[in-house]
C-alpha cells in the first residue's frame, strides 16, 4: 500500500507539531514535504519513515 507522507503521519497518530518536537524539522518544512513542494533528503525521509513505522518503499510521491 502506498501512502503520502501526510497520510503516513496521520496513520501513525502524529500532528505536525509532534513530529517537529520529536525530529526538529520545521513545521513549514514538513508542510512543503507533505504537499510535494519540496523533497526531503534520503536521511530525513528515513527518520520520518522510522517514526511513522513505514518503509521508504511505501511512500508515494505526487
Label the predicted regions.
Residues 13-32:
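Short alpha-helical DNA-recognition segment
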Residues 6, 17, 46:
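Residues within the helices of the helix-turn-helix
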Residues 1-11:
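A short, Lys/Arg-rich alpha-helix, primarily the initiator
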Residues 24, 43-58:
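DNA major-groove recognition helix of helix-turn-helix/homeodomain DNA-binding modules
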Residues 9, 20, 49:
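The alpha-helix within a helix-turn-helix
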Residues 35:
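Short, conserved catalytic or interaction motifs in soluble domains
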Amino acid at each position: 500500500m502506498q501512502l503520502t507522507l501526510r497520510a503516513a503521519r496521520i496513520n501513525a497518530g502524529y500532528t505536525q507539531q509532534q513530529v517537529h518536537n520529536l525530529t526538529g524539522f520545521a513545521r513549514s518544512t514538513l508542510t512543503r514535504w507533505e504537499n510535494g513542494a519540496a523533497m526531503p533528503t534520503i536521511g530525513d525521509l528515513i527518520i520520518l519513515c522510522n517514526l511513522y513505522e513505514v518503509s521508504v518503499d511505501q511512500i508515494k510521491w505526487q
